[in-house]
Every structure is written in structure tokens, then in C-alpha cells.
């Protein structure tokens, strides 16, 4: 990763860190690198519902067209839908304007290659170098060689049809509350679940440009937990701002996280003989309970760094097709090239229908060890992470767990945060440990 590109593209406060001028340059550089040798020089652009999306889209489109590349606009669309549409429309690349689960002030730009996969570090570095060099060497075509813009009117229909084709079950009889996070899935998610026969109660599906992720979605599932109980629904589904993740809620209003969803789906695939290489890829944030549950079934667990790009790398390296994160970023490579919250939900719903078991019972396949996570906002992540004082404190606190837990302190790849996670048998002890480490981080910063 370079200066601009983090674990999930370029992110920052819109109109400050991520200005229209920067978006224009990223568009020019991205078009030159990704589409210059393409016989079909067009790029798909989608976005979430943030107020800054129109501004950044206009700048990005101008940059791409100024490099002689056409633009296919798909409007408000989930990130994984853009990955799919890039392949479906045979474009040279796809671009998403979104900051996922981040607050409305932020926005971001991330690319997909022609195959629908996120870019490698090397390709991102090439784009970044061009931007830093003011796009030197990128041509300025004139006349008929300037890029054109076309609105893809049936983009949502194409994705809904594709998503439904991955399920293979009738969802009739299921009542589902769907939290759309006032984000990119506010239209397509309810359509998909309804089309397959479910009774859908959508909430947080009225975006106004500033309410994305505001007290809703997968990072704030409390309202969904209440709604599932009050609606007497079978379960709830919570997407985030760009719908590349999903968490679930059982009929009793209890949260079912990405680890539990992965255990449910992995065991189902394993029993059907469909779990490629009998392997699941997870990150260091996954609960120890996941490891125990999968190993009990004879399933190999491969662990990697936080970030769905790293999960994808390990999937490809290990010949595996399924993996994800506790946060609900889950990849089914048999269906899509990136984490897809709607497709993940459909796989979970398929297991519920096929087994006839409620989500509560299925989630009980995994016993979660107590885990505590706290985010600390810092000015200098590198200063904190390189501090010998912090390293000594972590080592000291780990000794207190006596081998029956772990501590993980890591910087966020997309926000000015350091995340402190402790896992063990006693929540009271974990609170004390995390509290002490948080105080040390604040003192260092």
C-alpha cells in the first residue's frame, strides 16, 4: 500500500482529503492504467448514497473521459454489484465511490479490474505514482476520441437477477427485517429477498444523503435487534453503507456475526462436499470459537491479516473458495469476486430453508469466547504502533491471560484508529486489560 491507497482503496474526508481535483486525477490515472490497452475502453462507475457522491462522481467521470475512456454509470449500487456489472458489461474496469461503513463525512474510491477482482498492490501503486506525478504522460485526446458517458438503466435489474440465481431456494414462509443502512442496498436488497418469496420489512431504507450508517446498518445493529422482536420476524439482516457485508439477528433479537455465519455456511458446504479444499480463510479478528467449531468438523482454517483483500489473496493461494471476516465481509468465490452482503445473506437463508432450523439453533454450532474490542482515535497510528512502551504493555497483559486468550492491537486500514481487541474466558478481566491498553495508547499519542 502507498500513501493514497489503503486496504480498501482511497479514503478520506470528502472535499478535504478526497477533493474533486484529486478524484479527477485518480480518474485520469486509473483510466490510463486500466483501460489503455483494452479493446473495449469503458469503465463502470457506481456509488453509495452519500451527499458527496455526486460531486466526486462528476470529477471522476471527467477524469476518465479526459483520458479517452467511456463511462458506464450505474448510479447508486452496492460495491459487489459493481464488481459483477464490470464483468457482465465486459468493461475494462469498475469504480466505486463509497466509504463503506464510515461516517457520512468520509468518502472513497476503489477500483475493480476487468475480471471483477480488486486491484493488486502493484497496480494501485502504478495509479498512485501517476497521480503524484500530476498524470504526466497521460494523453489529452480531442474531438471524437474523448470518452462518452452512458447511463445503464437496467443495472439494478441485472444485479437482482444475478443475485437471485445464486440462491436456489424459495424463501416463502420467512419474515425478514432488512436494515439497509440508508445506503447502497436500499432498493436492491429488499427486491432480492422479496423476489425469492420472503416477507420483507425494510428499515433504514430512506437515504437523504447524510443519514448513511447513522445509527443503523451492520455497525449499529441495535435498532434491527429491536425491530426483529417487535415484528415477530424469523430473523433480521443488517447491511452496511455499500452492502459488501452482512450481519444477522435471530428471532430473539440476538446478533449473529460474521464468524457465526461462516461456521453455519462452511459446515453446510462441507456436508454437501462443496467446500473447496476443505478450507476456510479468516482473519486474526475471528473468534477462537470459530477455529474450534470448524476444526471439530475437520475443516482447515487459514488465518490472514484484517481486510477482505488479504482474505481473497489467501483463498487464491490455498485453492479455497470461501472465507471472510467477523465484520460480515464474506466471500463466496463460486458466486462473486468480492465480499457481497446480499449473496452471503442468501447462502445463510438457503441453509435455514434446507435444514428447517431457525437461525438461533444454527448459530449455536459455535460457542463464542468473550471478546472485547475498543477503537481509539489517534493522530499518528505509526507512532503508537511502533512504541516500545505499548509493546511491553501488550506482553505484560498477555501473561495475565495465562495462555487462555489473546490480545490484538492493530491500526485501522481506513480510519485514524487503533483497534484494541482482547479475548479470553472472563469479560471482567478483558475490560480491565483493554482499559489499561487504551490509556497507554492515549498517553503515547
Swiss-Prot record:
The active site is at residue 100. Transmembrane segments: none annotated. Keywords: Isomerase, Magnesium, Metal-binding, Phosphoprotein. The keyword DNA-binding does not apply. The lineage of its organism: Bacteria, Bacillati, Bacillota, Clostridia, Eubacteriales. GO terms for cellular component: cytosol. It holds the Pfam family PGM_PMM_II. It catalyses: alpha-D-glucosamine 1-phosphate = D-glucosamine 6-phosphate. InterPro entries: A-D-PHexomutase_a/b/a-I (IPR005844), A-D-PHexomutase_a/b/a-I/II/III (IPR016055), A-D-PHexomutase_a/b/a-II (IPR005845), A-D-PHexomutase_a/b/a-III (IPR005846), A-D-PHexomutase_C (IPR005843), A-D-PHexomutase_C_sf (IPR036900), A-D-PHexomutase_CS (IPR016066), Alpha-D-phosphohexomutase_SF (IPR005841). Its cofactor is Mg(2+). This is Phosphoglucosamine mutase. Catalyzes the conversion of glucosamine-6-phosphate to glucosamine-1-phosphate. GO terms for biological process: carbohydrate metabolic process; peptidoglycan biosynthetic process; UDP-N-acetylglucosamine biosynthetic process. Activated by phosphorylation.
Amino acid at each position: 500500500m502507498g500513501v493514497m491507497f489503503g486496504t480498501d482503496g482511497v479514503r478520506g474526508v470528502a472535499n478535504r482529503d478526497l477533493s474533486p481535483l484529486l478524484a479527477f486525477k485518480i480518474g485520469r490515472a486509473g483510466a490510463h492504467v486500466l483501460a489503455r490497452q483494452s479493446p473495449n475502453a469503458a469503465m463502470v462507475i457506481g456509488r453509495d448514497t452519500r451527499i458527496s457522491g455526486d460531486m466526486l462522481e462528476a470529477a471522476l467521470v471527467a477524469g476518465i473521459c479526459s483520458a479517452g475512456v467511456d463511462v458506464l454509470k450505474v448510479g447508486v449500487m452496492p460495491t459487489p454489484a459493481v464488481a459483477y456489472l464490470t464483468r457482465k458489461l465486459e468493461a475494462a474496469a469498475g469504480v466505486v465511490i463509497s466509504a463503506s461503513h464510515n461516517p457520512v463525512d468520509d468518502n472513497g474510491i476503489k477500483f475493480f479490474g476487468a475480471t471483477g477482482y480488486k486491484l493488486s498492490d502493484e497496480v494501485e501503486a502504478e495509479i498512485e505514482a501517476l497521480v503524484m506525478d500530476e498524470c504526466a504522460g497521460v494523453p489529452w485526446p480531442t474531438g471524437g476520441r474523448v470518452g462518452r458517458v452512458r447511463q445503464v438503466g437496467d443495472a439494478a435489474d441485472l444485479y437482482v437477477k444475478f443475485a437471485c440465481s445464486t440462491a436456489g431456494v424459495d424463501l416463502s414462509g420467512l419474515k425478514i427485517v432488512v436494515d439497509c443502512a440508508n445506503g447502497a442496498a436500499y432498493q436492491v436488497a429488499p427486491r432480492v429477498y422479496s423476489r425469492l418469496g420472503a416477507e420483507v420489512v425494510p428499515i433504514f431504507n430512506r437515504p437523504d444523503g447524510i443519514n448513511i450508517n447513522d445509527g443503523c446498518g451492520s455497525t449499529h445493529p441495535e435498532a434491527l435487534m429491536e425491530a426483529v422482536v417487535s415484528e415477530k420476524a424469523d430473523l433480521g439482516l443488517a447491511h452496511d453503507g455499500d452492502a459488501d457485508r452482512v450481519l444477522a439477528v435471530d428471532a430473539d433479537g440476538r446478533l449473529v456475526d460474521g464468524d457465526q455465519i461462516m461456521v453455519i455456511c462452511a459446515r453446510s458446504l462441507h456436508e454437501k462436499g462443496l467446500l473447496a479444499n476443505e478450507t476456510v480463510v479468516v482473519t486474526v479478528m475471528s473468534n477462537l470459537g470459530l477455529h474450534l467449531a470448524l476444526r471439530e468438523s475437520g475443516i482447515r482454517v487459514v488465518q490472514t491479516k484484517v481486510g477482505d483483500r488479504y482474505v481473497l489473496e489467501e483463498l487464491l493461494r490455498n485453492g479455497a473458495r470461501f472465507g471472510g471476516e467477523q465484520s460480515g465481509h464474506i466471500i463466496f468465490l463460486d458466486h462473486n469476486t468480492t465480499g457481497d452482503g446480499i449473496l452471503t445473506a442468501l447462502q445463510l437463508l438457503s441453509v435455514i430453508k434446507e435444514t428447517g432450523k431457525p437461525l438461533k439453533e444454527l448459530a449455536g454450532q459455535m460457542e463464542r469466547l468473550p471478546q472485547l474490542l475498543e477503537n481509539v482515535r489517534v493522530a499518528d497510528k505509526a507512532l503508537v504502533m511502533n512504541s516500545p512502551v505499548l509493546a511491553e504493555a501488550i506482553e505484560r497483559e498477555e501473561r495475565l491471560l495465562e495462555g487462555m486468550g489473546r490480545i490484538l492491537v492493530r491500526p485501522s486500514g481506513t480510519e485514524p484508529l487503533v483497534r484494541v481487541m482482547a479475548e479470553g474466558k472472563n469479560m471482567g478481566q478483558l475490560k480491565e486489560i483493554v482499559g489499561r491498553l487504551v490509556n497507554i495508547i492515549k498517553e503515547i499519542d
